[in-house]
């Protein structure tokens, strides 16, 4: 029986990814979508992908509920919003090994989204179901470790997001 417990513990400790490893793998995969003065197209491309692959979520973008990829491409709003989103994801990946800063930034993101009526379940799926497929559409070759790192970041992000939503008195999952 003792050997069984030892094996289970060994497997659990091997499968857990350290914050430093999560940071390493997520930051590496972000090379497919850099930020910079001449990189706004990466943020626009995110919203083109998002509006094409997740049409049901356009309802959260007042005035753009019927936008398609061409509309997003021409929109100053989505140029700015895309740059902001891209920067936010870069920050989350780059500070992941500093959990106090990571959690503080997640709370700030929830504060900024407080009045937007975003379904709290969306925070649970964002990185797994939206961000990772977007990265792959941009040519990122994500290893199993990279996908596991994004899954871990997503889990931690969602946990803190739900905590903050509850604190704000908003619906939470």
UniProtKB/Swiss-Prot annotation:
One GO molecular-function entry: iron ion binding
Pfam families in the record: Globin
Annotated signal sequence range: 1-16
Miscellaneous notes: The globins of the nematode parasite N.brasiliensis have oxygen affinities 100-fold higher than the rodent host's hemoglobins. Two isoforms are found, one located in the cuticle, and the other in the body of the nematode.
Residues covered by the Globin domain: 17-166
Tissue specificity comment: Expressed only by adult nematodes in the gut.
Protein family membership: Belongs to the globin family.
Subcellular location(s) of the protein: Secreted, Extracellular space
Gene Ontology terms: cellular component: extracellular region
Source organism per UniProt: Nippostrongylus brasiliensis (Rat hookworm)
Keywords per UniProt: Heme, Iron, Metal-binding, Oxygen transport, Secreted, Signal, Transport
UniProt: heme b binding residues: 113
Annotated protein name in UniProt: Globin, cuticular isoform
Entries under Gene3D superfamilies matching the protein: Globins (1.10.490.10)
Gene this protein is translated from: GLBC
Database matches in InterPro entries: Globin, Globin-like_sf, Globin/Proto, Globin_nematode, Mb-like_M
């Amino acid at each position: 029986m003792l050997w069984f417990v030892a094996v289970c513990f060994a497997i659990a400790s091997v499968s857990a990814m350290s914050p430093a490893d999560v940071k390493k793998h997520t930051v590496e995969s972000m090379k497919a979508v850099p930020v910079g003065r001449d990189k706004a197209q990466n943020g626009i491309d995110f919203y083109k992908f998002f509006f094409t692959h997740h049409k049901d979520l356009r309802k959260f973008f007042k005035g753009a509920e019927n936008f398609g990829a061409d509309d997003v491409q021409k929109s100053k709003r989505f140029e700015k919003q895309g740059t902001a989103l891209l920067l936010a994801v870069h920050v989350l990946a780059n500070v992941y090994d500093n959990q106090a800063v990571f959690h503080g930034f997640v709370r700030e993101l929830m504060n900024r989204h407080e009045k937007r009526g975003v379904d709290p379940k969306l925070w649970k799926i964002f990185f797994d179901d939206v961000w990772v497929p977007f990265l792959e559409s941009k040519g990122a070759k994500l290893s199993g470790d990279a996908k596991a790192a994004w899954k871990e970041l997503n889990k931690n992000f969602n946990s803190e997001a739900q905590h903050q939503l509850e604190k704000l008195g908003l619906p939470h999952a």
